[in-house]
């Protein structure tokens, strides 16, 4: 098969693919595959985005940059778009994060920040028990995993620093259409009292009613978590929820 025949076969994978996918598609040896990939790179039909990932165009020199979510899926095959990136995708925040946040239960030596094809990726490794509530969306020919809206909120309650702070969670709770029963179920499934405390406090502040279903023991209330762990440990104590409200009083003005 000549290089143009190989190109047509590869185009069936879409405009971005991995070397592993190409080998499975073409059914050839690594040596043969490397030969054709290098030939197509020289002719301008392919562009190497990073090790093992290529973009393709049927017009030489016209390869495009893949969608950041698609690239994130290829970089972290066992992951899902999450936190601030998922908040933005669902329209739960007007903020546009400069970094794509990917959650994965698979421990690997990921760098703190990956920069690939001019895009920034932050990989957050969580325990397998916290990796649930995953949906699938289609972008071009690719399916991409993303946390569903309720899991996105719960993850942001768990790690507010990956969503722009607790204020972004408050905005999302106020403006988004959410299944509150599922939201509470997910919060309980996280096995984190801090998540339940933050959810209860914010729900009470917005009058959502979720707070009425949250049960905390006296011991839970005497062990104080920070409302926003991304901010300094200061501020008044809330004994109803066992929280230290470490945000200024005018913090809520733009929302309420």
Regions found by a protein language model. Give the residues of each.
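Short gly/ser-rich loop at a beta-strand->alpha-helix junction or flexible surface loop bordering the NTP-binding
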Residues: 19, 38, 43, 48-61, ...
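Short beta-edge/loop segments at beta->alpha junctions of small alpha/beta modules
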Residues: 1-78, 177-193
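Hydrophobic alpha-helical interaction segments
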Residues: 134-256
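N-proximal short alpha-helices
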Residues: 6, 13, 56-59, 122-127, ...
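Phosphate-binding glycine-rich loops and adjacent basic patches that engage nucleotide phosphates
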Residues: 1-3, 30, 43-52, 112-119, ...
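Residue-level marker of positions within ordered structural domains that often coincide
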Residues: 27, 91-92, 158, 204
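A residue-level signal for conserved active-site and pocket-lining positions in enzyme catalytic cores
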Residues: 22, 86, 153
């Amino acid at each position: 098969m000549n290089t143009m025949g190989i190109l047509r076969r590869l185009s069936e994978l879409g405009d971005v693919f991995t070397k592993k996918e190409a080998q499975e598609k073409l059914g050839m040896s690594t040596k043969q595959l490397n030969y054709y990939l290098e030939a197509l790179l020289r002719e301008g039909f392919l562009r190497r985005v990073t090790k093992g990932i290529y973009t393709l165009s049927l017009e030489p020199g016209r390869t495009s940059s893949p969608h950041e979510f698609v690239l994130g899926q290829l970089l972290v095959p066992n992951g899902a778009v999450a936190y601030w990136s998922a908040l933005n995708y669902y329209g739960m925040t007007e903020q546009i994060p400069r970094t794509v946040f990917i959650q994965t239960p698979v421990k690997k030596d990921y760098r703190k920040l990956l920069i690939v094809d001019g895009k920034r990726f932050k990989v957050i490794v969580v325990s397998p028990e916290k990796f649930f509530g995953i949906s699938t969306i289609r972008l071009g020919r690719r399916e991409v995993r993303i946390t569903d809206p309720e899991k996105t909120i719960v993850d942001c309650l768990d790690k507010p620093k990956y969503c722009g702070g607790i204020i972004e969670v408050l905005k999302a709770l106020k403006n988004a259409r959410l299944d509150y029963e599922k939201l509470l179920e997910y919060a309980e499934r996280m096995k984190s009292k801090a998540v339940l405390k933050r959810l209860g406090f914010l729900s009470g502040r917005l009058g959502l009613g979720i707070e009425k279903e949250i049960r905390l023991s006296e011991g839970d209330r005497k062990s104080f978590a920070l409302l926003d762990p991304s901010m300094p440990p200061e501020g008044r104590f809330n004994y109803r929820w066992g929280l230290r409200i470490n945000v200024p009083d005018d913090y809520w003005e733009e929302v309420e």
